[in-house]
Amino acid sequence: MTTQQLKEKISKIIDNFSGIRVVFTTTANELKLSRIEGSALNSIAEGFIDKIKEDIINNEDLTSPLLSNFDDRKNALFKFDYEQYPEEFNKITQAIAIPPNSQDYYNPLNKFTDVKGIIILISGDNKCLALYKNKTNLAVLRNSRKMFNLVPDPDGYLKQLPNEILRLDFNYDLFSIGEDFYIKNHKTLETQMKFHQVIEAQAVIALNSLRDSLLIEDISGLEKSSREISFARKLAKISKHSPVLGKIDTKTIIDYVSQHKYLSAILQINEAGDKLLIKTKTSQKHFIKLMSDDYLQSDLTKIIYMSIAKDRLDE
C-alpha cells in the first residue's frame, strides 16, 4: 500500500465516522472497555481525528517505509513487516473484535494502576482505525508525597483532588488499519513491546538462510555477534531486503569478491575457493554490506562507492 493509498483509506474512515471506543489493556493481559460520558467521548473523538488529519491526511511530507528499513527520518510511519508480532498487536486485533453489546468494563477502583496501554477504535465506512498508546507515568495524576493536586471549587478555594485523574492526550505510538500495522513512535516499540525478540527471531532466519547457502565456511562468528542487538538488526535487515542472499548463487558471489579491488583485500576465501571466511568483526561488517549490495562502481569514473541509500532508476 502506497502512502497515498494509506491516506485515502484513512480518509474514508474519518469522512464516514460512525463511532469511537476506548479500550484499556491491563497488566493482567486483559482488555477492558472504558465507560466515558458521551460529551467527553465526542471530544476525545474530535481530538484524535484532528491529530490524524495533521499527522497523516494533510501531511504532504509523509512517507511510509518498511520498518525493517528503519532510519531516523522525520514525517514517517513505518509499516511493520516482520514475521513475528509483539503481543500488543494481538491485543489490538482482539479489541477490534469486541462485540458491540459487551459490558466488560474497566473497574475504576483500580485507579488505573493496572492499565498498560490504551486502544482507541475509530470506526467508519464499515472499517476500523485502531490507535495504540502506551500509558506513561505522567498519564495518571495522583496525590503522593511528591505530588499534591489542587482544584478550585465554586467559591474560589483550592481543594485537594480526592481522586486520580487519567490524562489523555491525542498522541499515539502506532495504529492498525486492515491487517497492516504502522509505527509512529519507534521508542515505544523498542522499550515497551519486547521488539528485540522480533529482531532476534528475524536474525535467526537470516542465519539459517546463510547456513543453507553454503556461502560461509564457519558461521559461528556471525552467530556469536547476533547476540548483540545492533548486529542482530543488520542480520534482520538482510533477511528481509538483501538483493544478494538467496538471489545470487554462491559461485558468482565468490568470483565477485575475489575480483573486487576493495573486497578482495578484506574478505578471505578458503583454500578450496568455494566459501568465504567470516571470522573477524571487520569481515562481518563488510560481509553485511556485501549482502546489502552496498559496494557500487561508477561506469564513468570506475570509482568504487559504498552506498547505503540506493534509489533504483530502473523501476
Curated annotation (Swiss-Prot):
Short name of any one Pfam family annotated for the protein:
KwaB
Phenotype on deletion?
Answer: Cannot be deleted in a Kiwa-containing strain of E.coli.
Keyword annotations for this protein? Answer: Antiviral defense
Q: So which domain of life are we looking at?
A: Bacteria
Q: Does the keyword section mention Acetylation? A: no
Q: Which GO terms describe its biological process?
A: defense response to virus
What is the annotated role of this protein in its UniProt record?
Answer: Component of antiviral defense system Kiwa, composed of KwaA and KwaB. Expression of Kiwa in E.coli (strain MG1655) confers resistance to phages lambda and SECphi18.
* Name the record gives this protein: Kiwa protein KwaB
Give the organism's phylogenetic lineage: Bacteria, Pseudomonadati, Pseudomonadota, Gammaproteobacteria, Enterobacterales
Quick one: which gene encodes this?
Answer: kwaB
